[in-house]
């Protein structure tokens, strides 16, 4: 478990010391929880992250938040953001003696995540496209412990008026230490 609390105003953004902004603190509270289980040929991982920003409606109006070349008037800053996910995989090669003896692994896995980068205050507009659900299934093949070949099919599920986003991903990763 990890957490953080602090004031986000006046870190790098100057403000009018006598104006309305002088009363703002932009209290930021973050919390994070994660776990990993790796035993008996199963691997499971999960996480939960949440952040809350005080004075979110007023932070949007502070001067100096955008460059002069920005095409946007003022972007909204939500009061909160959330991300959570769960992944479970099973080592299929654990049931095949020769592959198990060679220390090869083939994990079939499923993954689910939910995230929303903009949770508005009651006075702010809602942007439903910021809320996303994602599911994935795939295989992770370890021919040797330091190399993994990955294949994944995933789909992001958006609100009805938007298109879902399917994808296929292939990759190779190497785990090593640099001296």
Indicate residue ranges for each PLM-predicted region.
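Outer-membrane beta-barrel pore domains
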Residues: 3-179
């Amino acid at each position: 478990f990890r957490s953080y609390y602090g004031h986000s105003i006046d870190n790098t953004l100057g403000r009018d010391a006598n104006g309305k902004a002088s009363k703002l603190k932009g209290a930021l509270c973050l919390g994070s929880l994660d776990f990993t289980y790796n035993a008996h040929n199963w691997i499971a991982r999960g996480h939960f992250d949440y952040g809350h920003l005080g004075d979110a409606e007023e932070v949007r109006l502070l001067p100096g938040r955008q460059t002069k070349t920005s095409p946007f008037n003022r972007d909204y800053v939500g009061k909160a953001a959330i991300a959570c996910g769960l992944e479970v995989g099973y080592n299929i090669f654990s049931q095949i003696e020769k592959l198990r003896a060679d220390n090869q692994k083939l994990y079939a896995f499923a993954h689910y995540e939910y995230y929303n980068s903009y949770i508005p205050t009651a006075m702010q507009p809602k942007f439903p496209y910021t809320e996303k659900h994602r599911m994935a299934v795939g295989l992770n093949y370890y021919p040797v412990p330091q190399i993994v070949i990955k294949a994944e099919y995933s789909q992001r599920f958006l609100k009805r008026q938007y298109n879902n986003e399917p994808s296929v991903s292939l990759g190779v990763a190497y785990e090593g230490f640099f001296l």
